[in-house]
Amino acid sequence: VHLSGEEKACVTGLWGKVNEDEVGAEALGRLLVVYPWTQRFFDSFGDLSSASAVMGNPKVKAHGKKVLHSLGEGVANLDNLKGTFAKLSELHCDKLHVDPENFRLLGNVLVVVLASKFGKEFTPPVQAAFQKVVAGVANALAHKYH
């Protein structure tokens, strides 16, 4: 993904303020609620029977935290997303058999969560830069599928 210096500054500047644990839990939780078919990849997580069950589920929160920490590695390596996510791409493709479309969905949900957390600070240029990043990460995670 090609980002201008200004776009990189938008992303890294805001990312420094992101509470990865909180935002990760909310983004993954929202994904599982809004797109319930994604729950099939999380059978071992226990009760996902309602929105409140999903949002309060400790395993959802823990995995969301893990996802956002990985995304943070991507933000730190914006010029090498494919390399940064190569092992995760392999894991999700070969072992977990996750539909790569889910990476795009999660990226879009993440942008919504960031917008809700940061309000006016999440300006149109910041949103546009984050959309590029989440699209680049989704492509990097889907790389092994091609």
Curated annotation (Swiss-Prot):
It comes from the Eukaryota. Keywords: Acetylation, Heme, Iron, Metal-binding, Oxygen transport, Phosphoprotein, S-nitrosylation, Transport. The modification Phosphoserine is found at residue 44. The modification N-acetylvaline is found at residue 1. Involved in oxygen transport from the lung to the various peripheral tissues. Pfam families: Globin (PF00042). Belongs to the globin family. Heterotetramer of two alpha chains and two beta chains. Coiled coil: none annotated. GO terms for cellular component: blood microparticle; haptoglobin-hemoglobin complex; hemoglobin complex. InterPro entries: Globin, Globin-like_sf, Globin/Proto, Hemoglobin_b, Hemoglobin_oxygen_transport. The modification N6-acetyllysine is found at residues 59, 82, 144. The modification Phosphothreonine is found at residue 12. Residues 2-146 form the Globin domain. This is Hemoglobin subunit beta. Red blood cells. Heme b binds at residues 63, 92. GO terms for biological process: hydrogen peroxide catabolic process. GO terms for molecular function: haptoglobin binding; heme binding; hemoglobin alpha binding; metal ion binding; organic acid binding; oxygen binding; oxygen carrier activity; peroxidase activity. SUPFAM superfamilies: Globin-like. The modification S-nitrosocysteine is found at residue 93.
